[in-house]
Amino acid sequence: MYRGLLSLIIVFILTSLALAKNEDKILQALIYEEHGQFQKACNIYTNLFHENNESIYLQKALLLALSSDLKQKKELLKASKDFLEHTAIARLNALYFFEIGDYKQAEAILYKLIKEEQDYRNYEILGDIFAKKALYTKALEQYNIAYKLFEHESLLLKIVEINIKNKNIDQAKKALEDFSKKSGCTFKTCTLLLKIYQEQKNNKASIQILKQLYKLHNDIKYIYAIIELLVQDKDYTQALDLTQKYNIDSDTKIFLYTQTKNYQKAYEIALKRYELSKEKKYLSMAGILEFEIYMNPKSKKITDPKRLASIIKKFEKSVDVRSDALYQNYYGYTLIEYDIDIAKGIELVNWALEQEPKNLYYLDSLAWGYYKLKDCKKAYEILQKTFHDKEFSNSDESKEHLKAIKKCLKK
């Protein structure tokens, strides 16, 4: 139901000297309205109407009675029949008929009102009736007329909703864009616009809307959403700039630094985070990042025994059966590859496979472990499970392992 503006009454009070004697009662009614005590407010307006027979009191009482379904609704509707020459009261009657589903009577009142006045509400209610009847083209026509008379958000959203129903996405988008340019970003309009941009894979426009939503609500989730889109676009530098400007978590920073291959910075954050929180996963991250920093670019291996010992120590302190599969596999593969403890390495990789049974990298690690144990037949059987993925099978490491295992089988 539609609720009138309080300013209507305030203006009425200030301009009507004849009603000065009722100011206290009207102010009390306004206070009741402000606090949501609509029955008490309606009682005052109803009494004022009975005492003065003034249409403005009937209008206010009827509006409250209809919008809050109050006890004197029928009484006031009956009384309003003698005041239908007042457009506001006639419109309330149209609303009542609309609410009870008597569209014929509602339309008759509205068409009469449209002849008498160009008030956007007449067209909007008529549009609502057509929308209820699923006559969306007619509804849109009325909403557009109403919107030309008064551009407000609730009307815009009705126009957008029908355009989306009719698959006119570009028209819906344009209406939202035009409104946001004129009136600024609101939560509803910008959220709808964001949804359209995201469905159209328009990351650049989505980021601009997310920035506006962040200014509107100061909610960090919008910054995270921007970072996610920048990652999709592989714009890691700009994403990192946001992590410096806002309070972004360490995991996101570590991820972004690894994407830019700044492993040293990622390593420093991971180690610092471990020292502060004692969360084992950060020590595991530090182990992986230390490997990336110091491995030989050509052989992809650690050649310094002291550095390898430092990495292994980090894994020993942080990786167990409850760890993420990624860390279990990385630690296990390191033990296998460097012939440190092949049996333990296989156990760790099996833990990882319990979590992710179809992970190609983990299967490759397990196959390599059995190759190191000279069980080449089993190694080949396991490696065969990765052959369906051509991209993985064509990787240098996979081809190297397959070549070694096949050579072993011929012995």
Set out the residue ranges of the language-model regions.
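Residue-level recognition of tetratricopeptide repeat
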Residues: 30, 63-64, 95, 128, ...
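Register position in tetratricopeptide repeats
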Residues: 34-35, 64-68, 99-100, 132-133, ...
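Alpha-helical adaptor scaffolds
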Residues: 288-306, 316, 320-356, 361, ...
